[in-house]
Amino acid sequence: MFKKHTISLLIIFLLASAVLAKPIEAHTVSPVNPNAQQTTKTVMNWLAHLPNRTENRVLSGAFGGYSHDTFSMAEADRIRSATGQSPAIYGCDYARGWLETANIEDSIDVSCNGDLMSYWKNGGIPQISLHLANPAFQSGHFKTPITNDQYKKILDSSTVEGKRLNAMLSKIADGLQELENQGVPVLFRPLHEMNGEWFWWGLTSYNQKDNERISLYKQLYKKIYHYMTDTRGLDHLIWVYSPDANRDFKTDFYPGASYVDIVGLDAYFQDAYSINGYDQLTALNKPFAFTEVGPQTANGSFDYSLFINAIKQKYPKTIYFLAWNDEWSAAVNKGASALYHDSWTLNKGEIWNGDSLTPIVE
C-alpha cells in the first residue's frame, strides 16, 4: 500500500513538473489592420511589450519639421550634439495646412520620405502627422472653425468639400505608399488634439462638449482609416490616437479599439508630474505614448530630466515620447543628456540586435 502511494505521488510530481516546465505561451499584440505587413506586426508587438522591461523601455523621439518647409535632420543633429545620442523616433508632418495654394492637395508634401527611409534603415522608426488644410475652403485655414453642417459636407465625397479632402488623402496615401514599398513601418498620427478648439476637425469652443461634433470626428477618422487600409491597401501603418492633455473629453473622440493601435497624449506642461489623462488613456487597454511633448513656457528653462523621472514614477506604461522641435526641443532646454542617457530611455541604434529587434520581455 505504501509503495503504491509513493508511486502515485511520484507520477503526480512528474506530471506537475512537466506542466510547470512547459514554456509560457507568448502574448502577441497585433496591429488593428489584420493584413499588416510582417515587419509592422513585429514592430507593433515589440512596442507593446516595452513596459515589461526593467530598463531600455521608453523610446526617445523628436519632431523633424514640416515636409518641404521646415523638415530636415537638423533636430536630430542638435540632439546628438547635446547628448551624444539620436532619437529613436523621428517625426515629419506631410500637411502644411496654413498654405494658401491653388489646389488644396498642393499643401501636401512627402519629400521627407527619403530621410525617413534612411532613418529606418539606420535603426530608427518614423512618425508621420498631418496638420491638414481645411476642406471647407479652397486651401489653408487649418485653424479656422467650421460648423457641423460644413463638417458633414467634408465627409460627403460628392461635394466640393469632400472632393478636396479626398484629393489630400490621395496625395498622402501616395507618400505613404513610397514608404511601404521600401518596407518601412510608420507611426501614423492623423487628426490629433481633436478635443481642443484650435483645429478645424476638433471642437469649436473651450471644453464645451458637442456630441454631434464627436460623432462627426469619429466618422472622419474611420473614413481616413478605411481609405488608407481598404481602398489603398496600406499595410505598414501603426495607428495613433492622440488627444490634448490640457483639454477635457480625451476619450470621447476615441473611434474604437478596431481603429487604434497606440493611444497617447499631446502634452505641453510646466510640471511633468501633473499631466492629465494618463489613467483615462491607459484604461483603453492600448499601448500608451506621449505623442507630442514640450514645455508650456518655451524659454529654455525646462528640465527634461524631470520628464523621464515623472514617466518612471507616474506614467510607467509609456512606450515612447516625441518632443517638438524649435524652442520646445530637449536640445535647447535643460536635462537633455539626462533624458537621453536614463536607464529607461531607448535611443536610435538600441532598437535592433543585428537583423532582429532586441528581445521581447513577456
UniProtKB/Swiss-Prot annotation:
**UniProt xrefs under Gene3D superfamilies:** Glycosidases (3.20.20.80)
Alphabetically, the GO molecular function entries are: mannan endo-1,4-beta-mannosidase activity
Asked whether the UniProt record includes Hydrolase among its keywords, one would answer: yes
Coiled coil location: none
- Superkingdom as given in the UniProt entry: Bacteria
Catalyzed reactions: Random hydrolysis of (1->4)-beta-D-mannosidic linkages in mannans, galactomannans and glucomannans
Q: Which GO terms describe its cellular component?
A: extracellular region
- Conditions for induction: Up-regulated by konjac glucomannan and by cellobiose and mannobiose, the possible degradation products of glucomannan. Repressed by glucose via the carbon catabolite repression system. Also repressed by GmuR.
Q: Where are the active-site residues found?
A: E193, E292
Annotated EC: 3.2.1.78
SUPFAM superfamilies per the record?
A: (Trans)glycosidases
Signal peptide residue numbers: 1-26
Q: Where in the cell is it found?
A: Secreted
Recite the UniProt keywords alphabetically. Answer: Carbohydrate metabolism, Glycosidase, Hydrolase, Polysaccharide degradation, Secreted, Signal
Q: Name one Pfam family in it.
A: Glyco_hydro_26
Chief localization: secreted
Residues noted as binding substrate in the record, renumbered to the chain? H131, W198, Y268, W324, N325
Residue ranges constituting the GH26 domain according to the UniProt record: 38-349
What this protein is reported to do is described as:
Involved in the degradation of glucomannan. Catalyzes the endo hydrolysis of beta-1,4-linked mannan, galactomannan and glucomannan.
Could you describe the subunit structure of this protein? Homodimer.
Report the protein name in the record: Mannan endo-1,4-beta-mannosidase
- Protein species of origin: Bacillus subtilis (strain 168)
Lineage at the top is: Bacteria, Bacillati, Bacillota, Bacilli, Bacillales
